[in-house]
Amino acid sequence: MRLLLVLLALIFSVVSAQQNTCAQLCKDNKDMCCSLSKNSEYLLTTHNKEEKTQSCGDKFNSEDYYVAGSNRFGCGNSVTICKVQSDDSKIEITPNRRFGHHGGGVAGSIANAASSISSVANSVSSMTNSVSSLANSVSSLAGSMSSSGSSSSSGSSGSSSSSSGSSGGGSSGGGSGGGGGGSGLVVGKERRFGKHGGGGIAGSMNSAATSLSSLASDVSSVASVVSSLSSSSSADAGSSGAQGSGSTSGDGNAPPGSTGGTGGSSGSSGGGSGGGGGGSGLVVGERKFGHHGGGGVAGSIANAASSIASVANSVSSMTNSVSSLANSVSSLAGSMSSSGSSSSSGSSGSSSSSSSSGSSGGSSGGGSSGGGSGGGGGGSGLVVGERKFGHHGGGGVAGSIANAASSIASVANSVSSMTNSVSSLANSVSSLAGSSSSSGSSGSSSSSSSSGSSGGSSGGSSGGGGGSGELLSQNQVFATCVRVISTNVGPNVDIEDKIGKPIMDASTKVCEDLFGSPYCQWTDNHIVTAVSSKLDDGFPTQGAFNVTRSQYGYIMENGHYLNNKGNSVRIN
């Protein structure tokens, strides 16, 4: 009897152990586990597709989502599967950087900061070219206003004003615009930071900040020069109002219809040809931070954040200067518009009674300014995603990088504001060019010539070159994704026997969401990528959702790539 009781107890313990096996294996994320989400439309099941083997006795149904192969996603993990909408089949994804044993996303964070600084550098470089071009335009206008219409006292008695208005006043060709941008900020070769981190991050980031600060100083200097030119032009505008005060043409003895004067090409400024292209941006090599990744990184990045904040202040100050300059030029345009009204002084055709004198006096085509063609495309934008700092968190690194990102965002906003100010300035200068082109067209000839129609044909400035233009497509749908939950794990499958591709299949619902078909078309020309992910990353947990390129990159870079070799799972 005692033996029977022992046997019963042994059998009971074995049954209990078997019942606990599934839960324990799921908890330990082993090769076998039980289904955790039977009621979900989005389930991922890994097993041998050919044999249809399953774990824990769960019944396979048509709504399960499964992948042939090993336990590459584990049990109960969330997996994001995305189908790229673009026809580009060569989308390259850069995985997270790893920094030794405890690693983390420090590299990705610094890379994002570097990319943002590069974008700001390109924007400011483009702005420098635009302001330089505007400076040349204003300088040309200053020259044309100072000499416009100075030959209005045409023709002595009997000469029928033959050379009247033939002055080429202000026919400056304008500036050629800014040159091409520099080669950008290049930060050395690969850095190695030893066993416990620290190293030259501060030097790299501070070098970038110093370069930006110098660039801001240069643009501020250009703004001061343009402001000075604006003041000079304003003085010229005040002194030009007395031009062409009536012609002293012939006494009536001249033959009718004589040469009449050409009317001049006064004010025919060609304007600036616009700025050159931006620089190549900031290149930061791979960083390795040793065993613990910590060290002096936080302090280094904090110093960089402080430097970038200083740049933000400089750019903000420069924005105010350019805005003030825009107002000054706008006011100058208004004053010039009224001062140029004396250019019709050639209409006093009281001489040469036998001719059709005065019929075309002052017929200048003033104000035909072409205006500026506008700036180029925008920069690549600022995208700051979630930072992960590994097992030990990296101390104050997160706060330091967050401060740096905030400062960079401030710079980006300031540059954006400055862009608007410079755009306003360009419009004002264009208006100024039109206003000043009518002054100096002193075609006071009293002959029958109708020439003089080319006065003031300013070409304006063509604007500077833009950045990479990435913002233009920032909000476009790049991929469609679904979230699934891994439920079952079965025996391994040699994916090399499957032409190197993991075999994937899915429920009808998922296929319809991804491909618009009851069957998943894994062999089409679009890339389908699966990565494990977390449900708390802000993306929907049920149903298909669209993502932009930057969001897709975030999902891929922050996901955990897994296949039987620990690499990315990719179809096609």
Curated annotation (Swiss-Prot):
For bias type Low complexity, the affected ranges are 145-165, 231-240, 326-358, 433-452
Biased amino acid composition, Gly residues? 166-185, 258-282, 359-382, 453-469
**So which domain of life are we looking at?**
Eukaryota
- According to the record, the residues making up region (Disordered) are 145-199, 231-297, 326-388, 433-469
Q: Which residues form the signal peptide?
A: 1-17
State one molecular function term (GO): lysozyme activity
* UniProt record, GO biological process: chemotaxis; defense response to Gram-negative bacterium; killing of cells of another organism
Keywords of this protein's UniProt record, alphabetized? Signal
Q: Which PANTHER family match?
A: LYSOZYME-LIKE PROTEIN-RELATED, METHYL-ACCEPTING CHEMOTAXIS PROTEIN MCPB
UniProt lists the family membership as follows: Belongs to the dictyostelium lysozyme family.
**Protein's name according to its UniProt entry:** Putative lysozyme-like protein
Q: By which gene is this protein encoded?
A: alyL
